[in-house]
Design a protein with these regions (language model features):
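Membrane-embedded beta-strand positions of outer-membrane beta-barrel proteins
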Residues: 10-12, 40-44, 78, 99-103, ...
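Transmembrane beta-strands of outer-membrane beta-barrel pores
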Residues: 14-18, 30, 44-50, 82-84, ...
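Flexible, solvent-exposed coil segments and beta strand-coil junctions
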Residues: 1-7, 54-64, 135-144
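Outer-membrane beta-barrel translocator/channel fold
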Residues: 41-92
Length: 165
């Protein structure tokens, strides 16, 4: 973690609502004192509803879709905070334990979820609507980029408190 005056790191994160890959992080830190650091970072996180389930198309195309899904939700989070080294590791042995606190703006990025739908033996790409679409006529999900031009931004605030091992 912190062996110099200034450091940066990036990575891929996993979270309980994010699927296989939850998101990504980029963080910069600068030393304030021996065990205390100022941090500035940005995270982009995929947020899935806990009840999302993938289904295979009843039409036999091998494509999957999520019944009931209206939007993809990503959270873009800016963070400014502090990190305190609680236990420092000895050279290449042991573990380091850090306490972290950060706060900053969040922007929820809502992107409409589109499906490929069979209507009158033709495939159509449409925004999912359970009052219009029937389960057995869904071919699968459309490209993620299908609704990108209809993105909606929802502002908010995020607070992060963590112990890092």
């Amino acid at each position: 973690y912190f062996d110099t005056e200034n450091e940066k790191y990036w990575g891929i994160s996993k979270n309980s609502w994010g699927g296989l890959i939850g998101g990504g992080v980029l963080k910069f830190s600068s030393k304030i004192s021996d065990n205390f650091y100022k941090t500035i970072g940005v995270e982009l996180v995929n947020i899935r509803h806990p009840n999302e389930n993938k289904y295979s198309s009843a039409l036999g195309f091998g494509r999957t879709f999520i019944w009931g899904k209206k939007n993809y939700l990503f959270s873009l989070r800016g963070q400014y905070g502090r990190e305190l080294i609680i236990i420092n590791k000895k050279e290449q042995e042991g573990i380091r334990i850090n306490a972290q606190f950060a706060i900053g703006p969040s922007f929820g990025l809502l992107i409409p979820y589109y499906i490929k739908y069979s209507r009158n033996n033709r495939m159509e790409i449409e925004n999912f609507d359970s009052s219009v679409h029937t389960f057995n006529n869904v071919i699968g999900s459309a490209s993620f980029l299908e609704g990108i031009n209809e993105i909606k931004i929802k502002p908010g605030v995020n607070i992060k408190a963590a112990l890092n091992f």
